[in-house]
């Protein structure tokens, strides 16, 4: 009898511990405010997965190949707003992991891969408190083992690209980036990382700066793209 009583007591204590742990781990989903154990609730995770591209490497060609995890619509579009304007940084870590997992499954291994996130200007960084591209890139590197490099800086403040024509976008970011105290050397394979790709004006401007230093930019990886072709 004592052994049975002791076993029952241990089992009850373990159940209480697990319940307390689950309560501690639970949080509110940043997208819908439902209770969630993971970063987002299961419902919102499914909504995000529905935006995933069947072939993330469908645009991996040309002068600056593009690798895009998803389509910039629906829950991805809404979650990006929550990330950048409501400060839900955990969303960046979620997308960094999704992008990294997809990259590892879809792309051949690239030797000496160095990841450079598209930087924010110092004024925007101070206002927002973080650079979403850098958070995504940090998680990407953590999963893939790629090296993170932060020597690229945005030296000139630019207006938001949204609503600008293609030519105006190119003019807006021209001369806005520079390498500062960089230790990058020729022979490295550089992958640019950003949250969203629309016309590509920003990443092309960055690639031009890096290539002017005889650095090889193999492409750009983003969470989502608005391309329809």
Predicted features and spans:
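Glycine-rich phosphate/pyrophosphate-handling loop used in enzymes and phosphotransfer proteins
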Residues: 1-229
């Amino acid at each position: 009898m004592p052994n049975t009583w002791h076993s029952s007591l241990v089992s009850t204590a373990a159940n209480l511990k697990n319940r307390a742990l689950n309560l501690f781990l639970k949080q509110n989903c940043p997208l819908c405010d439902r209770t969630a154990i993971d970063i987002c609730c299961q419902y919102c995770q499914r909504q995000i997965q529905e935006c995933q591209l069947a072939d993330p490497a469908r645009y991996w060609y040309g002068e600056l190949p593009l690798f895009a995890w998803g389509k910039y619509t629906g829950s991805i579009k809404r979650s990006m707003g929550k990330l950048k304007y409501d400060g839900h940084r955990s969303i960046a870590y979620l997308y960094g992991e999704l992008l990294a997992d997809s990259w590892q499954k879809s792309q051949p291994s690239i030797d000496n891969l160095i990841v450079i996130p598209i930087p924010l200007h110092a004024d925007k960084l101070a206002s927002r408190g973080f650079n979403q591209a850098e958070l995504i890139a940090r998680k990407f590197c953590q999963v893939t083992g790629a090296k993170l490099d932060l020597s690229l800086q945005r030296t000139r403040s630019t207006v938001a690209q949204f609503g600008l024509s293609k030519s105006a976008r190119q003019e807006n970011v021209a001369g806005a980036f520079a390498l500062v105290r960089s230790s990058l050397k020729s022979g490295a394979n550089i992958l640019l990382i950003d949250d969203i790709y629309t016309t590509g004006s920003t990443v092309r401007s960055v690639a031009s700066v890096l290539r002017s230093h005889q650095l090889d930019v193999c492409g750009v990886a983003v969470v989502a793209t608005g391309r329809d072709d």
